């Protein structure tokens, strides 16, 4: 059996296992500003769709938002890996997320032969959120009170809307925006939204595509390919996890604790990493499960 044949045969049991299962993929990192990388990811998502998986895409846009802010002479501010969002930043986020990136992904899906529907969390009551309260966070070695501004915590997901789109053969493309119960706009961390949507849809998999190869050790020399919830708690406690990896792991842990079978964090900048993670025995990134089992 040659290498091509062995790759296909290695994929077969996974394709069979994942058939008709729901997978939520969070697109983030450099792919948001590199159309070639984005198209490669979209090709993978369309392939998953055509082998029988129910695919939901949730996209970020952090690098693009930061570039737009810089062009307008505004500096981005982050605390604990979360963007501080004032009114002007919220307007920029809405323009970039729902206006530019969402439309670009839907167009790429169409060019690759599938049907995408671009929606944001504030369409059709898809996501109801509440403003994130002022809270104490560690900034360096100091504990400070932080107001993230127009940033929300997800409270409700209208899963029926997404199920209707999936049943009709569409790939939902979701921008991480939401409304509160009074109709006020809020920005939602894309990792958090993807995790909550995965829980609401009872998804089999949650995938986070980012700029790093997975969850790394403190020295950043080694990837943890398999982690349990207990492992993640230990890494969070000893300071191994920091910056933008914090919300990714928090979303992954929350999803797994609420029934998602496996959460994966991997580099989305290498061609077809998504397929290698899902359809090969060794994978390429980090998989988080409730216990050390193979999925």
UniProtKB/Swiss-Prot annotation:
It catalyses: N-acetyl-L-glutamate + ATP = N-acetyl-L-glutamyl 5-phosphate + ADP. This is Acetylglutamate kinase. It is found in: Cytoplasm. GO terms for biological process: arginine biosynthetic process via ornithine; L-arginine biosynthetic process. Belongs to the acetylglutamate kinase family. ArgB subfamily. The record marks 26, 248 as: Transition state stabilizer. It is an enzyme of class 2 (transferase). InterPro entries: AceGlu_kinase-like_sf (IPR036393), AcgluKinase_fam (IPR004662), ArgB (IPR037528), Asp/Glu/Uridylate_kinase (IPR001048), Glu/AcGlu_kinase (IPR001057), NAGK-C (IPR041727). It comes from Methanocorpusculum labreanum (strain ATCC 43576 / DSM 4855 / Z). Its main location: cytoplasm. HAMAP family: ArgB (MF_00082). GO terms for molecular function: acetylglutamate kinase activity; ATP binding.
